Structure formats: structure tokens, C-alpha cells
Amino acid sequence: MGQSKKLNKQPNSLSPLVQLAGIRKCFDGKEVIPQLDLTINNGEFLTLLGPSGCGKTTVLRLIAGLETVDSGRIMLDNEDITHVPAENRYVNTVFQSYALFPHMTVFENVAFGLRMQKTPAAEITPRVMEALRMVQLETFAQRKPHQLSGGQQQRVAIARAVVNKPRLLLLDESLSALDYKLRKQMQNELKALQRKLGITFVFVTHDQEEALTMSDRIVVMRDGRIEQDGTPREIYEEPKNLFVAGFIGEINMFNATVIERLDEQRVRANVEGRECNIYVNFAVEPGQKLHVLLRPEDLRVEEINDDNHAEGLIGYVRERNYKGMTLESVVELENGKMVMVSEFFNEDDPDFDHSLDQKMAINWVESWEVVLADEEHK
């Protein structure tokens, strides 16, 4: 989350495929998308991420042509498609329910779109079989949907969506109906398929782990607005505000007060009663309130016994949760704040398996913290 962990950013040479400009949408007089601008690049896997009701599915439906905008423009490959019917947009959508035809075979489900487009009969079989090979279902062509597993149905829906070679594939929470293990498997398969096809994917989800795993770029939304737009690493390690920080994974938020600025990067501050140096990349004044954000895995803990003294935030272990590779501890600071700490499991460390009520000192590597201004005390 800090300077010492940043990777070099790769230059973005992708060209725009979809451009949303000044998009506004209301339902029953209620504004759900007040003013949205978004560019989606050729060949990228972009995820719209946010809580229920944030507007992400509405944006997807506007791109697909399943809803009409109240104002603004939608461009696809430099062509204005704002008022173009959905069937003429060269955009396909995979819904959460998959929407397979139960009376048709897998082959006929995949071929349906080609027949609707009046594709020459001689082309249909090779194109359908090519699509089924891409999703490793060529031997299932004559089965009915009820004879397939959930993951196989998912792949049929994707094959049907890509068989007519759309410019853009939209996926609306299309993994959420799968069990955990199958969902993890499909995340990898979907990303590999996207790379193989070279088609631009726009994926909608409220699952943060899913977004971090699959995406080239994540757009975090709240109340119809974009809160942050960046790579998974940027979103996780450099959240721009408290909403993004709290929505993406676990995070600890410490209250801090500025004492003085030391140099261009560092500020001396009181953090939950402890004086320390923090990295602040914006102007601050003595006495100003700040938030210091640290992920559980970025914290370091040390047991304190009666005969030793340790620097750091002092607290006591209140809960321990064994997670296989990690041990998660909840530490209560002396001021009552609860802090989550995650440590990689090390059975050779005699002090690793902390006892309940064990006194602890919490520290972190300087510059790994993210510091945000306190909006309420500006």
C-alpha cells in the first residue's frame, strides 16, 4: 500500500472502443446515473464494481441498448450508437441466469444467434464447433442444458455470446450462481478465454475478490458515480477515498493529528496516541485531522512481556482465526479501537500463535500506509 511496494506502471497503448459521455439515467423520476463519463479500451477486461444499487448494472444495460439514456452519448468504435437498437450494436450480454433454451441442444443454443442473423448454413456448424472448442465443450454439443453442470451451462452461454464475434461482451454477475470452488475455476477460465479471443469484456460484480482476480481495470461505483478507476493493484493499495478503502477488502483506519511536516514526503503525527512519521503527499497544517489506512497484512506485531518494552500501538489480542496460510488476530488498542492483523502462518515461530489477552505492539513499515484527509474536519 505504500511507496516501497509500488510496481512500475505500464504505458497504456490501448485504443478506446466504448465511450460514455455525460450519461444520465432516471427511473420513475429518480436519478440513478447523474453524470457519468467512462472510456472502455479495446481488448481489456474491465469490471464495474460496487454495492447493490450503485448503478453498475444500469450502465451495462445502457451499453447493451436494453435501456435508453435520458441524456449523453454512447460511442462504439467511433460510431454513435446512443439510439441504435440492441440487436444492431454488435454487443452481446451474458446474464446471471444464462438464459439457455431448455428444449434446445447445446449446439442449437450456440447456433441460435447465427440463425437469427441469417448466417449461411454452411458456416454455422464450423463456427459453432469452434466456439464450443474454445470453452472445451465440443463433445457436449448434443446434450440439453439440464444435462450440464452449472459451470458447463456458464460456458455454453459464453460460447453463444462469442460465436457471432461481437466487438464487446457484457457479463452481468454471471458467476454469482456458482459454488465457491467452481466460481474460482471459472474466473481463471473466463480470463484465459478473454485473452485468447481478444474481445473486450465488461464484467459487473459486487464481489471484490472476483474483481481483483479477473480485471485489467476496475471501476468502483457508488450512487451512480465513479469513485475510482484504476488497475486492481491501484484500487487495493492506493484507495482514493474512505469508501473505496472500506469496500475493497479488509482495512484498518487509524485516526491521526498532524504535529509538523518534516520534509516533502513525511509528516510527524499523533496516530491513535503514538507519535510517528507518516507519508503524506498533500498539504497539511499542524492540528489537521487525518486517516491512516493499513491493510491487515501490512501490520507487524510483537508480543510484549513484563520484562521488555516495545514501540508501537499497544493492545491486547481479543480474537484469533486460523485461515490455513494465515492467522488473523483482532487486537484491541488501549483506547478501545479494534485492529485486524493478518500474519503468514509460521509453525516454527514460538511467538506466532498468540494467546488471548496477550499484550502486543503493532507497527508497520514506514511508507506502506495510505493517508487521506478527514473530510469531516477540513
From Swiss-Prot:
Reactions mediated catalytically: ATP + H2O + polyamine-[polyamine-binding protein]Side 1 = ADP + phosphate + polyamineSide 2 + [polyamine-binding protein]Side 1
GO MF annotation: an example: ABC-type putrescine transporter activity
CC terms in the record's Gene Ontology section: ATP-binding cassette (ABC) transporter complex
InterPro entries: AAA+_ATPase (IPR003593), ABC_SmlMolc_Importer (IPR050093), ABC_transporter-like_ATP-bd (IPR003439), ABC_transporter-like_CS (IPR017871), Mo/tungstate-bd_C_term_dom (IPR008995), P-loop_NTPase (IPR027417), PotA-like (IPR005893), PotA_ATP-bd (IPR017879)
Location within or outside the cell: Cell inner membrane
Pfam family, one: ABC_tran
UniProt keyword annotation of Cell membrane present: yes
Membrane topology qualifier: Peripheral membrane protein
Domain ABC transporter: 18-248
Chief place where the protein resides: membrane
Binding site for ATP: 50-57
PROSITE patterns, per the entry: ABC_TRANSPORTER_1, ABC_TRANSPORTER_2, POTA
Signal peptide: none
Subunit structure: The complex is composed of two ATP-binding proteins (PotA), two transmembrane proteins (PotB and PotC) and a solute-binding protein (PotD).
Function of the protein: Part of the ABC transporter complex PotABCD involved in spermidine/putrescine import. Responsible for energy coupling to the transport system.
The protein's name: Spermidine/putrescine import ATP-binding protein PotA
Protein species of origin: Escherichia coli O1:K1 / APEC
Lineage: Bacteria, Pseudomonadati, Pseudomonadota, Gammaproteobacteria, Enterobacterales
